[in-house]
Amino acid sequence: MALLGAVEAGGTKFICAVAEQPDAPPIETISIPTTMPAETIDRALDFFSRHELRALGIASFGPIDLRVGSPSYGYITATPKAHWQNTDLVGPFQQAFNVPVGFDTDVNGAALGELRYGGGQGLDSLVYVTVGTGIGGGAITNGQVIHGLIHPEMGHIPVRRHPADTFA
């Protein structure tokens, strides 16, 4: 049976998984440290090459180009992550597996996961905010991830330190 593949491409690690159905538990997962682009992507390609895929979804740190038809669609663009600027993330997977590849931000992927399988079940709209390697957010309204000009860019949130905060 051809499987569904998923990549959560984070600034610290890539989590790759395969499952039979969208709501089924993963059959296999792997955690790959996010090092240099070629090394990290090659390790992910190697993981998926052991499985027959019917589709793949990638949720990535960014900024990324989500404009289908753009010459840089599927790229991680002007990221502060060292060595990852202008990295084609989608292309290597499309070329290797010749299956449909979905692509979105890591926080939009997490927001969609919460809506369908987590704390947002039963809702049709939500905002998801994460604090991890960076700060980001994704928003869903009427069951649809918000993209384009109306996308609320939540990744540029200044955090001012309180003078009494001794956290180092």
How does the language model describe each region?
Residues 19, 30-32, 70, 77, ...:
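Residue-level structural signal for beta-strand termini and adjacent loop
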Residues 17-20, 27-30, 37-38, 94-96, ...:
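Glycine/GP-enriched mid-protein hinge/lid loop-to-helix segment characteristic of carbohydrate kinases
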Residues 4-19:
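N-terminal beta1-alpha1 ligand-phosphate binding loop
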Residues 12, 61-64, 132-134:
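Short glycine-rich anion-binding loops that position phosphate/pyrophosphate groups of nucleotides
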Residues 22-52, 70-72:
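N-terminal phosphate-binding loop and adjacent alpha-helix
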Residues 4-8, 53-57, 102, 125-130:
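Short glycine-aspartate micro-motif
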Residues 13, 25, 71, 76, ...:
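Hydrophobic "anchor" residues
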Residues 41, 64-125:
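Glycine-rich phosphate-binding loop and adjoining helix at the ATP-binding site
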